[in-house]
């Protein structure tokens, strides 16, 4: 498991996939550039995961592709490797564009592309809101092979003619369910309008609700599908529990009782609003507990430094909104607490997928008031999973 993907669970993933998709058992079988293969092995991959072995070849052939697989199965590397295979680094123009719902995810994708493309001399820029616009303009004018960004800033840079689109041959929508949800739909259309008509579209996500699949028909041509059946999306390897807290006010004491357990590893605590994140952070600190916190309203610099501290293990407990739930990979997180149950069931899998990345064991604990029982049952039904009452020895499951 040197590459961080657990082959035992990975081999059991069942794909509901287009007939023409074949499996490439090794990276060599994909006929990738020599310099790219070097980057892949240097990054720590030994052999492709289930989604990689099916999707990379199809994307490299130029096919529009919909790839769905669980959190932590190597989806980011799937499109990153494909992009690096198809771009021509001699041409200093943007040839691939990746759109993500959060700034942190866009930045993480940039670092994956840079690492995998380490021997290729690739230029990749993170084009995200909340950062200096002058720096964006300077980088884009210099010429970037790949741009990884958030829809608002990318659309702005295209309109200002700093992000030139005429050489773009691939558009990737990462965490497409969130991107295509209400907020970003218009901005994506905005970006898409400026792209050359022959642009290949790749859609990647852990969940693909029907309305998203329906929307992809508008800008994808005969897409090849690499899909995991929904019943398979139970996030094997992650133990899910609930704690019954009769009233909202009792959640805080319950969390304090759990604090010693949290710090055995690293934990993320999810709240539904930024006000709740701020309130809970203040209350925990007043009670002399060490926590850090993050939400979408914080300045980008502050968010970056909190993320860095957490990644390096300097902070062990992070309180956050759903801005953190999508695709952020911190290897040491093995406990997620839903202080508030997510308001939509798709976000549940994104949140608890933060623990147990790449097939490692993880634990998810849901605080459930009497008002929440219905939501919990709905989540169980949707993912065909069972969420049991938390046992007393939860600490043993983490150590």
From Swiss-Prot:
Q: Which SMART domains match?
A: DEXDc (SM00487), HELICc (SM00490)
Q: Which residues form the Helicase C-terminal domain?
A: 237-398
Which organism's genome codes for this protein? Neosartorya fischeri (strain ATCC 1020 / DSM 3700 / CBS 544.65 / FGSC A1164 / JCM 1740 / NRRL 181 / WB 181) (Aspergillus fischerianus)
Pfam assignment, any one: Helicase_C
**A single GO BP:** rRNA processing
Q: What is this protein called?
A: ATP-dependent RNA helicase fal1
What sort of enzyme, by top EC class, is this? hydrolase
Recall the GO molecular function terms of this protein's record.
ATP binding; ATP hydrolysis activity; RNA binding; RNA helicase activity
Family in the record: Belongs to the DEAD box helicase family. DDX48/FAL1 subfamily.
Q: Where in the cell is it found?
A: Nucleus, Nucleolus
Q: Which residues bind ATP?
A: 69-76
In the UniProt record, the gene name given for this protein reads: fal1
**Which segment of this protein is annotated as the motif DEAD box?**
174-177
Q: Which PROSITE patterns match?
A: DEAD_ATP_HELICASE (PS00039), HELICASE_ATP_BIND_1 (PS51192), HELICASE_CTER (PS51194), Q_MOTIF (PS51195)
- Chief localization class? nucleus
């Amino acid at each position: 498991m040197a590459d961080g993907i657990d082959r035992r669970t990975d081999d059991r993933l069942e794909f509901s996939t287009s007939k023409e998709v074949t499996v490439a058992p090794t990276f060599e079988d994909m006929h990738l550039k020599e310099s790219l293969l070097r980057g892949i092995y240097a990054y720590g991959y030994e052999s492709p995961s289930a989604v990689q072995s099916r999707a990379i070849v199809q994307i490299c052939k130029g096919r529009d592709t919909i790839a769905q697989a669980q959190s932590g199965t190597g989806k980011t590397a799937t499109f990153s490797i494909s992009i690096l295979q198809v771009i021509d680094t001699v041409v200093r123009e943007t040839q691939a564009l990746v759109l993500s719902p959060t700034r942190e995810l866009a930045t993480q994708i940039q670092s994956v592309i840079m690492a995998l493309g380490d021997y290729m001399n690739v230029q990749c820029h993170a084009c995200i809101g909340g950062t200096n616009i002058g720096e964006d303009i300077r980088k884009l004018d210099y010429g970037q092979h790949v741009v990884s960004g958030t829809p608002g800033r990318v659309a702005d840079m295209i309109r200002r003619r700093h992000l030139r689109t005429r050489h773009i041959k691939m558009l990737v929508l990462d965490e497409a369910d969130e991107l295509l949800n209400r907020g970003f739909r218009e901005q994506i259309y905005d970006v898409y309008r400026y792209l050359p008509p022959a642009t290949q579209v790749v859609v990647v996500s852990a969940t693909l609700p029907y309305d998203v699949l329906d929307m992809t028909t508008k800008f994808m041509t005969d897409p090849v599908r690499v899909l995991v059946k929904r019943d398979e999306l139970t996030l094997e390897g992650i133990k899910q529990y609930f704690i019954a807290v009769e009233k909202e006010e009792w959640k805080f004491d319950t969390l304090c009782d759990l604090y010693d357990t949290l710090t055995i590893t690293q934990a993320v605590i999810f709240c539904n609003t930024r006000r709740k994140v701020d309130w809970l952070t203040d209350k925990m600190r007043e009670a002399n507990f060490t926590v850090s916190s993050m939400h979408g309203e914080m300045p980008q610099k502050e968010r970056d430094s909190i993320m860095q501290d957490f990644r390096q293990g300097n902070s062990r407990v992070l309180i956050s909104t759903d801005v953190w739930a999508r695709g952020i990979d911190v290897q040491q997180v093995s406990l997620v607490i839903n202080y508030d149950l997510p308001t939509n069931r798709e976000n549940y899998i994104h949140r608890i997928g933060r623990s147990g990345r790449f097939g490692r064991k993880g634990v998810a604990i849901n605080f459930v008031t009497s008002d929440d029982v219905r939501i919990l049952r709905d989540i169980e039904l949707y993912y065909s999973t069972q969420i049991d009452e938390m046992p007393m020895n939860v600490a043993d499951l983490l150590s």
